[in-house]
Amino acid sequence: LIEHSGTRRNLEVDFFGGEPLMNFEVCKQLVAYARSIEKEHNKNFRFTMTTNGIGITDEVIDWCNKECHNVVLSLDGRKEVNDRFRVDLAGNGSYDRIVPKFQKLVKARGGQGYYMRGTFTHHNVDFTKDLFHMADDLGFTELSMEPVVAPPDSPEALTEEDLPKLFDQYELLANDMLRRQKAGKPITFYHYILDLKHGPCIYKRISGCGSGTEYMAVTP
């Protein structure tokens, strides 16, 4: 990444899925190595940890708060929605195990530098209920929810019939965010963070994907 980044100073590394905490020692070693060489090459590494939460410990929390510019915490929302897919080898849902860990990590970060990231499917096209659950019941304010990517014949795949419902959900979310803003209790929705005057598209059209020159994702 350093060799191919040219004059770019800020470099992003995302520890991503599978599940990075299955190999936490390698994450620590890679960060330590990057820190040892970044000044020599006039680079500034920023690390992100994306995790399903099962492997979070006090050590992980301390390390993330010291080394990670951002932490992405995977939670699909309501318990029944999350536990439909996020299960362990025994088939047990993860919700009850991970929510307290996520809350502890976010509190230790001062409520900053994190996102709750969920995925909505054909089974929960009412995904604002999942976002509002995370905000109102769990106390999270930095939220992201993305559509599933699945084969068209998958039971989880979104359909043409789902689209009007989804459009209504995004409208509902926008209005609710305005209400919260006026009440002095705002929430952030990642995909609504847009610069209406200077969008990102022109840069992507000129330079393409930044993978390998300014950004890299590392799996276990």
Question: Can you describe what each PLM-predicted range is?
Answer:
Residues 1-14, 23-148:
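Radical SAM/AdoMet-radical enzyme domain recognition
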Residues 17-18:
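Short acidic donor-binding/metal-coordinating loop in glycosyltransferase active sites
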Residues 21-24, 154-156:
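A generic structural signal for short coil/turn motifs at secondary-structure boundaries
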Residues 84-99, 103, 107-212, 217-219:
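Radical SAM enzyme [4Fe-4S]-AdoMet core and its adjacent flexible, acidic
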